[in-house]
Design a protein with these regions (language model features):
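Structured alpha/beta reader/binder surfaces that contact nucleic acids or chromatin modification marks
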Residues: 1-165
């Protein structure tokens, strides 16, 4: 099964350019904490905007330019460790703090990733099955002409790996 994960467009861009190599998430509204980790080891990133349901007008198609492999995943239980990671990401620190504190169990799930740039960009039409505040989606097969190139590691990627080791 081919999986897609909705992520902020700014984060997708940082990953595509090698400036970020970690994904952070909390449990979704309909998920328990134990269900919300990164069980899928390879998936496409669907760029989105925070709470897209508030957007006016038709929802744009997904421009998918990155697939990722999860190298390691786990839980971050210590806010000080999350704080050290934040400068190496495109996430908004205030929003991440709210996510960390949003449940009785204070934690964020992380996935250390190896991203792959896609060429050409996969234009996935928006549909009702891809709507809503869910994070994970089943996707149709990608176009047959899609090629992948590993995104080279940067100093930010190396620092992130050290912080998560």
């Amino acid at each position: 099964m081919i999986q897609g994960f909705k992520e902020l467009a700014s984060v997708c861009q940082a990953i595509a350019t090698g400036q970020q190599s970690v994904l952070l998430r909390k449990a979704g509204i309909r998920e328990t904490t134990s269900e919300s980790g990164f069980a899928t080891k390879s998936f496409y990133l669907l760029p989105t905007h925070y709470h897209e349901k508030d957007a006016k007008g038709p929802t744009a198609d997904f421009q998918i330019s990155v697939r990722v492999d999860v190298l390691r995943s786990g839980d971050l239980l210590d806010w000080s460790k999350v704080e050290k990671l934040l400068p190496l990401t495109a996430y908004d620190p205030k929003t991440i703090r709210e996510h960390f504190d949003s449940r009785d169990e204070k934690l964020l799930h992380f996935a250390l990733i190896q991203p792959f740039s896609l060429s050409p960009t996969w234009n996935l039409p928006h549909s009702p099955s891809l709507s809503g505040c869910r994070s994970w989606f089943d996707l149709p097969p990608p176009p047959p002409n899609l090629s992948e190139t590993p995104v080279p590691a940067t100093e930010a990627v190396r620092q992130t790996a050290l912080l998560l080791s």
